Structures are given as C-alpha cells and as structure tokens.
Amino acid sequence: MKRRSFLKSLAAVPAASLALPRFAQAALPKTRITRVRIYKPPDLNPLFNQSNMLVTVETEAGITGIGEGGVKDTLEQCAGSLIGKDPFKIEAIWQEEYMAFFYPPGREKQDAMGALDLALWDIKGKALGLPIHQILSGAVRNYCECYNTGNVRPPASASGAPPTVKERVQATLDAGYKLYRMGAGDPGSGPWDVRSRLLQVARDCKAAREALGDSGDWSIDFHQRFELDDALRGCKLIEEYSPYLVEDPVRDEHFLDDIPRLRRMTSVPIAAGEEWGWRWDFNKLVENHDIDYNRCTLPNVGGITEYLKIMALCETHAVGMVPHFTGPVATAALVQCLVTYPLSVMFEYNYGNRQIPYLPQYTDFKAGKLYPNDR
C-alpha cells in the first residue's frame, strides 16, 4: 500500500469507529419491560429441595425472555422494579436490584435476581438473533463434559444383589460419561459412625480406580458431614487413588477457616460452593487457591451477569468450574456461559435424555456431553 493510501485509510478509522456504537444500538430495538409473569411448573426433581419457579419477562417489542429460580414472594418483590425499564441495560438493572430495599440481599433474593437476570439475557439473545455464547466471547469448546449425579445404574442381577462399584463404573462409562461420582456422606440407616464410614469410603475409592484404570476419573462428595480432622483422615486414605476432586470435605459453617487448613495438609483437589451466592461468599478461597474447582451455579449467584464475574475471578486464579445441577432453563444458560470458559469445566447433569414438557429442546445432550445450541 502506498503511503498516501495508507494515511487516507488511517484517517477514516475514527469516523468508522464513531459509527460502530450507532450500528450496535440500531441492532437492539427501543423497548421497555411491560410485564413479569411467575409460574410454578411440574416438579422435575421431587427428591431435591430446589426451586424451579419460572418467570417470563415481556416487552413492548413482543420479545419475551424466560428465567428460572426464586420463590413467589421474593420474585414479586424484585419483579415490580423492572416494569418500564430498558431490558438491555442488564448491568444497571442488576445493580439497582442489589442495592434496593433496606437490607443487604440474602440468598433468597439472589436466587430471584438470578431468575430475572436469565430472562433479560434471553431477551437480548432473541433480539440479536444470537446464542448467548456468541454475545459473550464465543465458544472455546464444542461441548461440556458431564457426570451424572447418581451415576448410571446397571441392569439388575438375577440374584437381586445390589450392583458392585465395578458394575456401576462400567455402566457409567458405557453411557459415555468419563467421570464416576460417589458419595461419602449419605446418612445411612443407623447412627453416624465416622470411622467405619471412612474405611468404607477408602474401599469404594480403591474399587473405582481399579475399575476405571486410566480410561476415566472419579470424584467423591463428602456432603459437608465431616469435621476437619475426619475430613483430613478421609482425604489421606484416598489420595493414592487420584480423585478428580473431593467435594465439600468440611462443614459449610467452617469453610472459610477449615478449607485453607485442609489444603495445606492434603494433595487431593478440593471442590466447594454449590450453596454459595455471589463472589463475596468465596473470593478469598479462590484468590488464595484454597479450592481447585468452584461449584457455584445458576440462578443462585444472581444470574449470568454475576456468573461472568465469577468466571473471570476463577480464571485469574486457575480455578475450574464444576456447577451444581440445576433446572433446565439455568442448565441451558450455564452451557452457554461455560463453553466460553478456557479452563477446566465439568458439568453435573441428571436429566439424561428426559424431555422437559414445558421446554422442549432446551439443550442438546448426548453420550455424557452437553452441547450449546442456537435456540
């Protein structure tokens, strides 16, 4: 390129740059929020005490967004302040909801804010004709690896005996999953006997590693049932079997004190956070790398708006994302977010190929993997 042509093209850059905001703004219709509806759908996970309330946010432009989470009273309280707002000013709405009312928002309000925030991002995606991962930074992976909450149960034996760990592992691998999950903190039928439970945990973990060989991974959930000394004893017993992660090894009320202590005394990767809200619940644990995986999920943290900030915090400190299972709307949103996350991702998923009657084709699941879609 000749010098004169180069200078001429360079001079045109500011004018082109000034035009970009107008072009971007033109892609979004001028509209306001007109109505928020709240629904109680069929209970998809009756064994779990988890809200699956649905919300729809309607606009003058005829675009309706769908969200999930919260309870009726809190949703109604939060929804009223949305009426008349520009649905595309998502951060401004989030900040106003966070600061509103007399008291700091608790986890119930965070969940309700998360439901409404999901609906606002849905509106934006529909207005632009783009999936959320394209509105963000674009996908860095084609799918998210999953594990099944209760694994895949093998066919019943002729004797009626319960399946062995080896049989459960094989059924899980055959279904396409690469990670087999176990629980260490199930209450059982008698008094809580920590010593015998930890010895059984060690036997099960050894059996899982032997069954998996080098073809897969295993993890175990301590379910916050162990004090620090017992958690340490359990972690030491299973270190040699190379777990993918140990989840919630200590009691929740002691997390901020005991997880850093445990971190210094064991080599197992630690995961925590399925009950956390936004970043201030755990930022120190992430910043000090006291955990390897963050289990926080949608809509609990306050929606996609907050989840993106959590992802940035975790990426900065090399912490992977392993969100707790959630409802179908939030699951679809999580997949859209996490295909943009460049570090380790593992997805807890327990719907399998089961159809959701009120939300067909909400995501694509196949052979242990969740794929984002353009719907």
Regions found by a protein language model. Give the residues of each.
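N-terminal secretory signal peptides
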Residues: 1-2
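Conserved, mostly hydrophobic/aromatic
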Residues: 62, 116, 129, 221, ...
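N-terminal export signals
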Residues: 5-25
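Glycine-rich, aromatic-flanked loop segments that form ligand/cofactor-binding clefts
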Residues: 117-154
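Metal-dependent enolase-superfamily TIM-barrel catalytic cores that perform enediolate-based chemistry
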Residues: 143, 148-260
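Shared catalytic-loop signature of beta/alpha-barrel
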Residues: 77-78, 85, 89-92, 236, ...
